[in-house]
């Protein structure tokens, strides 16, 4: 898989895609800090698609999140400098459906998307349109 520094990507912004030399980028873009990585992100056809990772200045993991078609989809986790989990979140098509947060190792939030939440209707609409798109592509 192609790997390159993220400053070699162009983001014109008019279509939401990242490009390398005028072509939507597929591969891994990374950002270095000092002697190590600060961040890396997988792309497919110009969209964030795969794993997004960041590191603290010490080199310890800061976050790992999954994306599909440019939005968070799947497990999202964050850690503090001591390696303690601070966020454990599940997203679906860009909508958070479940989240736990910790501060100094103590659980401070345990939340789940409820049918009464505004984002619930958004998620239902996204599911419908996403599945329709897969069917039209012959993947569903």
PLM features: residue spans?
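Glycine/tyrosine- and acidic-biased, solvent-exposed loop/turn segments at the edges of beta-strands
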Residues: 1-140
